[in-house]
A protein has these predicted regions:
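Acidic, PIN/NYN-like endoribonuclease modules and their adjacent C-terminal/linker elements
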Residues: 1-5, 114-144
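Short, well-structured N-terminal submotif of metal-dependent ribonuclease cores
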Residues: 1-43, 53-70
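Active-site neighborhoods of divalent-metal-dependent phosphate/nucleic-acid chemistry enzymes
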Residues: 2, 75-123
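Histidine- and aromatic-rich ligand-binding microenvironments
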Residues: 8-9, 44, 106-107, 128
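A generic structural signal for short hydrophobic patches within well-formed alpha-helices
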Residues: 13, 48-51, 85, 131-132
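Residues that scaffold the ATP/ADP-binding catalytic core of kinase and kinase-like folds
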Residues: 15-17, 54, 88, 134, ...
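General small-molecule cofactor/ligand-binding pocket signal
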Residues: 42, 78, 140
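Short, hinge-like loop/turn segments at secondary-structure boundaries
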Residues: 58-62, 95, 141-144
Length: 144
């Protein structure tokens, strides 16, 4: 049986997938590449939106923006579905009662990413500690 696809967050995708040429071979980058080796990588719709927002906010030119769009096109984007919406609503509620940081409005984007992983059973690879102890979410390192 093949392993499920891995959902990566915006930071991991930007570091591992985006061919920016500025990333050194840091221990974190090498670790992430090792964890993703042989696995299908997917992103949440929220991640695609964050990537494009970052480019627009930084006033990227047409050529650089085209390069980003081409890189995004190499990674399947998981759309927001009824299951993701349900997972998001339940997750935010559980986080509120548990006092988890994903309950906060300023972490709504992270909650959408987590909900995508929960709804589809994808483990999440992230460098962001906010996802630790998220109800119903498996982090890739914990799944190994």
């Amino acid at each position: 049986m093949s392993e499920p696809a891995v959902l990566v967050d915006t930071n991991v995708w930007s570091t591992v997938i985006l061919p920016a040429g500025k990333h050194n071979q840091t221990p974190e980058l090498l670790k992430w590449r090792g964890l993703l080796l042989g696995r299908e990588v997917v992103i949440a719709a929220q991640t695609e939106a964050e990537l494009l927002y970052g480019a627009y906010k930084a006033s990227w030119g047409a050529t650089r923006l085209l390069g980003l769009r081409q890189a995004i096109a190499t990674t399947p984007t998981i759309p927001v579905t009824a299951d993701v919406i349900e997972a998001f609503a339940r997750l935010r509620t559980e986080c509120r009662f548990a006092g988890h940081a994903l309950q906060a409005k300023d972490h709504m984007g992270d909650a959408w990413i987590a909900a995508t992983g929960i709804a589809h059973g994808f483990p999440l690879l992230t460098g962001d500690s906010i996802f630790g102890d998220t109800p119903g979410l498996t982090l890739l390192e914990d799944a190994s």
